[in-house]
Amino acid sequence: MGKIFFLGLLSICIFLVFFFYKQKVNNVIYNKIVEKFEDNVFIDETYTYLFKDSNLKELVFIKSQLIVPEFENKNMMKATGYLADAYRALSTVYKFDFKVHDNKILGFKSVIFEGFEDARVSKHENNLPGEKWQQLKDFNIGDPNVNEKFFHLEFPFVVKNTLCVTISKRFFKKIKKLKRLKIVLISNEDREYKIDIENFLPKYNL
């Protein structure tokens, strides 16, 4: 009887340790996908921060890598031209996805990273590959009016809006040095969605 009681108590303790560890880790949910096609490799790593009690539901940081062995040699990496430039631009991509729930389709006309108010922002489509995309400044928020004809509509269900912000490698290095991520999203209706969280990016090998 005593042995059974001890084993039961041990099981409860193990469950509690797992539960609290899981909760702590779940502040940022990590996911990694590796896809191979022929000799090429595509790696997609996502870091998801969940918000509570807000229309802003998730901040997702995404690092995507494309590895093409024939392009990895030194001569190719120093080459010029569309193909070489495109590969250098696409080999590692950093972006934030902001997920906002509403009963309307939203557009976002501005994104402000506190501390970098003078950052150079572009507003073109995030189509890949493309000459405009390769000329990425500090970050790109896409065309805020791409769904303008739907802005006036209200729906009887939740609309899951996603704002994709692609950031340059140079700008990513600057963001990684911050202690906190303070970001403001401004919608087409001038509504502000404010983020102020601990910067989790330095904790990972990015």
UniProtKB/Swiss-Prot annotation:
Keyword Membrane (UniProt): yes
Keywords (A to Z) from UniProt: Cell outer membrane, Membrane, Signal, Virulence
Compartment(s) where it occurs, according to its Swiss-Prot or TrEMBL record: Cell outer membrane
Source taxon at top rank: Bacteria
Disulfide bonds: none
GO cellular component: cell outer membrane
Pfam family name, one: BPTA
Coiled coil, from the record: none
Residues spanning the signal sequence: 1-19
Primary role: Virulence-associated protein essential for survival of the bacterium within the tick host and therefore within the natural life cycle of the spirochete.
Homology family: Belongs to the BptA family.
Name this protein carries in UniProt: Protein BptA
Source species of the chain: Borrelia andersonii (Borreliella andersonii)
Origin organism lineage: Bacteria, Pseudomonadati, Spirochaetota, Spirochaetia, Spirochaetales
The encoding gene: bptA
